């Protein structure tokens, strides 16, 4: 009771669910230009804030903050606040401001980096992820894990995907190339969209989000509409991306 969890919003929809599960108070800080506003997030953190989420790239907006900004943020929050750096889409990042975050771990024992095999590795149905952090923190996470949560099939698939890393990188490169093409086409068409760094693009249409999502679905293109906020569109094959652009 009295513990708080801080995040910028909108972001990954599971964060509020996790917060409610542990009966903590949720602190939401608005995004700035569709991007995590780390100075404002740091200002919202107090002695009762036990955890802060930083999603990089952010889901659903696809934007990133640079590693230098993350270092500054880590230096401005109390050491008693665990910072979870969610890098679910890290393989798709091409922004040179973002460097290897694991190099921050030795100097920041309150930092935990989470990654997944659900996105670039394509194993979403198997629910395989991992965390990197200080041994003491990882040990506490281990004690809360459900036994046998990652079954043998999922483990074998994850190992096979690691062994086939070159194939994964080729798929990611193809997605990034299509992301660049689709982004250019949208901007040529007058859309003002943030620079995407995930495997999707974000249409910040706010009040028209639900209507746009429904309209696209009627035209055979399924997207993820966030009512009152925007529409997230996954980068698919060239043909499907062209169908989306034509439907838009």
Q: Where are each of the predicted segments found?
A:
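Hydrophobic residues in well-ordered beta-strands that form the structural core
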Residues: 7, 28, 85, 113-115, ...
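Short beta-strands and strand-loop turn motifs
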Residues: 26-29, 51-58, 83-87, 194-196, ...
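Conserved PLP-binding catalytic core of the aspartate aminotransferase-like
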Residues: 31, 175-176, 180, 184-219, ...
């Amino acid at each position: 009771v009295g513990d708080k969890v801080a995040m910028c919003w909108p972001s990954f929809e599971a964060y509020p669910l996790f917060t409610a599960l542990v009966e903590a108070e949720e602190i939401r800080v608005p995004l700035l230009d569709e991007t995590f506003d780390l100075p404002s997030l740091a200002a919202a953190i107090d002695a009762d804030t036990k955890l802060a989420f930083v999603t990089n790239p952010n889901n659903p907006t696809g934007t990133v903050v640079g590693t230098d900004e993350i270092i500054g943020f880590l230096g401005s929050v109390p050491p008693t606040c665990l910072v979870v750096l969610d890098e679910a889409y890290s393989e798709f990042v091409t922004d040179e401001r973002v460097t290897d975050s694991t190099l921050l771990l030795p100097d920041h024992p309150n930092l935990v980096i989470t990654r997944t095999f659900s996105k670039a590795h394509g194993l979403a149905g198997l629910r395989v992820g991992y965390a990197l952090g200080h041994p003491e923190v990882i040990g506490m996470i281990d004690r809360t894990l459900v036994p046998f949560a990652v079954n043998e099939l999922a483990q074998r698939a994850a190992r096979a995907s690691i062994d086939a890393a070159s194939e994964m990188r080729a798929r990611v490169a193809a997605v990034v190339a299509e992301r660049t093409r689709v982004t250019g086409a949208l901007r040529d068409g007058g859309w003002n969209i943030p620079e995407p760094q995930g495997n999707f693009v974000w249409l910040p249409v706010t009040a028209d989000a639900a209507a746009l999502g429904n309209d696209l679905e009627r035209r055979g293109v399924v997207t993820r509409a966030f009512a009152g906020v925007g529409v997230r569109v996954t980068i698919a094959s060239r043909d499907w991306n062209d169908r989306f652009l034509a439907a838009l």
